[in-house]
């Protein structure tokens, strides 16, 4: 600790000192608010709104607003906010993250900033990690908010559009992070303003903020449509991979291995060696999937390479019951940070299809991205952002760097007395498991409940089998049994209870020492008062037993890549001043040690074990683990920061496109925009054939006539104009062409009416914009995947990506204008007389064909035999609709056939 810190205190301490002055002010108001009647207390909400309208700020009314919520909570919920919860609430009204230890009442704390900021009327979003927590927190706090005149909504998957709109219209909306992000994307795919759900993104309060803004940061939210089917190719290529041999390190000038591929476990990437490439190519040629003499890396084989690499990654880097589970014939992803299954989510880049082929389940078609956004960029759209979690301080630098959020550590209401014991290291996993089982046996004998944390479904099941063998009764909480999560967590605090859990560890639900009598009461159908009293008495007895045994004991079966996840596991114990203990058991075979400690360090540590099954505890061990975790955290931070720098480029473009879409949805008449675009497009086309300020000899009039005819359906005799009028120069010629285009368009508008034409313009613009944006997203994906290769040419990939993506975006906007004007100019508007004439001609023709016993289809398309139908008795203009009813111009339909005859 520096001298300055000793004198002035840390920044965190200085912030807390300042906030404690506000707490004193709020506490002084308590007697006055206690004296208010219910109606007077309820009336405070309207009073605060009026004061805000009158020019007061949120900070000015904060003490009174917090005092109001505290008093209402006492009356409605029977809970009084602690002073530390008031401090947490004040931190959350600013752009800050409140680190509040597990069990300190984050749900109740959130009511303070939510009420205060909802007074502005812009809406408040309380963001949770799953549906269960969103529903639970909303129902818990609903009586309090409704007492104060605030409406509460819940936004979870599966709601109808009306229910969603109602949820978003509420003053305070509880929602999952994924549903908020997807609704934002859906809003920007809507075809009318009535289809949109979200209003202004004002204030988001993110619960478990580290899970959402750090762990989920690399996961983009994607809405996709079906792309071309290629499942057969995944199944074919899947047969090749088992024959490939792994090589420990990449080939260099000094080292030439004999394997077919190498793995980078840190970044989860696989690479073919030269030997592997040849082997794959030989196999593909033998299977008839690639012609002889071709290369896997040739441009024409890029799709085949994509399938091979996806299959290689699926077999070598993604494990069943670790990264995913197979359930009901489908591959379900397991969240590496929480251990929860993520139903409905699919890996991109063909990886999910490759894993489906590997596991022998139905291979679904690949998808094409229609809209996407990362959590990083979605949550940065909010005017105000705040978050709370039990473990944020280790990631404080990242929160500040990426989101501009300062982390404030909130003191606990009662001192934390948990005993965090030194880590124990073993030579291998078997010795480690033996020690864990002995520790569990000891706890069970002393009637101390145990929570054992594992990093994967696979490890939880291995340990479960070992406990079964040892005859120890236990519960398992992992991705396969997540439906029973609340029930298992409710039982985890009973005397001698043993619970094995993946990283999820019942996060968001307290483990109550002695068990949860309320959960037991909920199982009973209409419990009597006597039954409830009996359950309470039983709980008090069990609670006393567990307290004497030392509270909840936490066992970590290995260190996670992030210290934060380890702290979350430890945080299940020692809540609100309860006793508790924790210890991590490690082995040299653990993933963290294998991937992030070099072979030299591992060998050095291996030599320290002189007796089989011996345990090692030392300060050096703690330093080695801390060093490995710091490396991993730095690696992942760089990855997230790098991803954000690339995504920021796409984000600027996304913002521009969505702004354009919203303009289109909010305006019924976009004719001015269409007119401006028409001028740009026609002038752009004319420039290509009549360069500005050029000589007449440089003009390509024939090319211009053909282009205008082909793309815009305009038959203009420009050559004749020039012959007839010697004074027709470049500028007047441009004006004449544009005037004719506008005149023809006005004639169409007069036929159908202004409103109908404006509606059509809007529809064409939206449809074209969506289609081109979808294609642009696919192009951006391909660019992103290959841009690193520019590094070999001594170019900065990030700068190249920015440059290329800007060029592609500009081309897309030009293409948008061109396609819209081309569609609007070519559209054929029929008069009532023309439609009636076409219908008569169609019926006459059908009658003639039927008389000759020739088939005619329902769409009135002419058959091969009807090509010689004689229309010479009726004079038909070349540009008139063909009387056969095909919808084509006569010159492009039967007119051309008559001419040939």
Curated annotation (Swiss-Prot):
Classification via SUPFAM superfamilies: Helical scaffold and wing domains of SecA, P-loop containing nucleoside triphosphate hydrolases, Pre-protein crosslinking domain of SecA
Biased composition (Basic and acidic residues): 836-845
Basic residues bias locations: 888-901
A Gene Ontology cellular-component term: plasma membrane
Catalyzed chemical reaction(s): ATP + H2O + cellular proteinSide 1 = ADP + phosphate + cellular proteinSide 2
Localisation per UniProt entry: Cell inner membrane; Cytoplasm
Membrane topology: Peripheral membrane protein
InterPro entries: Helicase_ATP-bd, Helicase_C-like, P-loop_NTPase, SEC_C_motif, SecA, SecA_CS, SecA_DEAD, SecA_motor_DEAD
NCBIfam families: PRK12904.1, secA
Protein name per Swiss-Prot or TrEMBL: Protein translocase subunit SecA
Organism of derivation: Haemophilus influenzae (strain PittEE)
Taxonomic lineage from the root: Bacteria, Pseudomonadati, Pseudomonadota, Gammaproteobacteria, Pasteurellales
